[in-house]
Amino acid sequence: LTRSDIKLVPWSRGYARTKSEPNSVLFGTVRTEKREDKFTWVGPLAPTAQVVIGEKAANHEPESLSYFNDYKTITIRNDVAEQILLENGVARSNLLSIHDSDLIPRILDSDRADFWAYGERIAFHLLDKRGIADQFESVWTLQEGALYLAVNPETDPAAVQALREALAAVKRSGQHKEILAAYR
């Protein structure tokens, strides 16, 4: 595996490709019961919480997920946070489903949406890069879990084992903790 083998694609495309193409891997995938049989899993890479983020100044205090039916929430197409909202009765018409998480801080800052449902750690990292993280807070936790590498199940088991061994080596070296600390 070389750097040229790694391709950055929108989440939805990467998810579909990893499900259908042997020797493909999707980085940073939440392992859920619905996804369990679709992939071979390597990890865990990092803890994660899928949350709904809102502007602090708005003082949102939702008591249930139905609260979000009165607002517009940004999601990443096919992301676990989007799936959780839909499965719990939030109408698709109240979701602004996009393909690129890098666009979300700009959309939030422009008042085109009220909330963002996504992984808490990476969401606040992206907000921090725009210098607006202190204006937002997590207002609802959808799910806690872990991120894994999702590997197409037809991938050579030796390649999967090599990924597992590489992850174990990174964890043993201490680099894993350094990487996680950079995104807190």
What is each PLM-predicted segment?
Residues 13-14, 103-104, 112:
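Short acidic active-site motifs
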Residues 15-19, 28-38, 114-143:
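A ligand-binding cleft/hinge motif common to bilobed small-molecule-binding domains
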Residues 47-51, 128-167:
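Periplasmic-binding protein-like
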Residues 1-37, 97-98, 182:
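Extracytoplasmic small-molecule ligand-binding "clamshell" domains
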Residues 40-53, 66-69, 88, 139-146:
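Short Pro/Gly-enriched coil loops immediately N-terminal to beta-strands
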Residues 1-2, 42-44, 65-69, 78-99, ...:
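Ligand-binding cleft/hinge of the Venus flytrap
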Residues 58-62, 66-71, 79, 149-183:
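Extended ligand-binding regions for polar small-molecule ligands
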Residues 18-19, 68, 107-109:
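Hydrophobic residues within well-ordered alpha-helices
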